[in-house]
Amino acid sequence: MSLLKKSFLLFCCIILSQVLKAQDAPYTMGFIPASISEVDVAFPLIEKWNLSGQADMQLVTQGAYTNGNPFEYTQRKVIRPWIIYSGFKNMKLWLGYAHNQKYAIEEAGNYKTLENRLIVMGTYTQEMPKGSLFEQVRFETKFFDDRNGNHQTIPRLRARFGVNHYLRQSKEKPIFLAPNIGYYTELMLKFASKDYADEHFDIFRLSVYYTAGITPNIHFLAGVIGQMQLRTNGTQFDVYYGPMVSLKYSVRPKERETFDSVDGGAD
């Protein structure tokens, strides 16, 4: 895991030099192991309007600065329903709501709060001979009470670019169906009030994963994630890293599932 941490730290330093302005106070950095587990259920709604739905359930656990166990504490539990419009070629539009129950973790400075999000998202996919590219823009507004009990309403803009490589299947009866190797980078900018946070930079995230089908209706993702988040004090970076797994059930069979919209992360 140390190699992953070093590589991610080097890449993040390059990104930071481009997206953060200089400050008098020095930056500090802490490393926190984490894990993300998710189960999704996708189902049709109104076919003639190209509408479908999806329900996501997510569990995020973490360690702390001096605790290397990514499963030590429960960070948050999430329920996230979506309505999806797929009437455009190569594009999907998503409208969603997220119910985030976050828990206190004294060692990491986390406090207990209930966070709700309203989300609008668009994903554009470009098919390639042996894979696909995708660009995703997500606008969400977060509603929660901060550690002082003050209510906060914070818009956040997220931009993701990803690549999927379709892997060959040489066996007549393979164990997994339509396997892929995927990876993406994602940048998140927050627009909070000055009394909460001065900086717009919020999170930079990287993820690499393997996806495949168990059956035409059940697909899974297994990978790793690394992300760097700026705390609201403007000088402390938390670097989260660890495993990510996801299982998706589609009521309608799918030949291939690449999990382009998976929301794997610890913030």
Question: What is the role of each PLM region?
Answer:
Residues 1-28, 251:
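Bacterial Sec-dependent N-terminal signal peptides
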Residues 23-25, 56-67, 98-108, 140-148, ...:
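Sequence/structural signature of outer-membrane beta-barrel proteins
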Residues 23-84:
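Start-of-domain marker
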Residues 31-37, 73-79, 114-118, 151-159, ...:
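Residues that define the transmembrane beta-barrel architecture of outer-membrane proteins
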Residues 37-43, 81-85, 120-126, 139, ...:
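Residues on the lipid-exposed face of transmembrane beta-strands in outer-membrane beta-barrel proteins
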Residues 45-50, 90, 127-133, 167-179, ...:
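Short loop/turn motifs that connect adjacent beta-strands in outer-membrane beta-barrel proteins
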Residues 51-53, 91-95, 120, 131-137, ...:
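Transmembrane beta-strands of outer-membrane beta-barrel proteins
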Residues 138-231:
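Outer-membrane beta-barrel transmembrane domain signature
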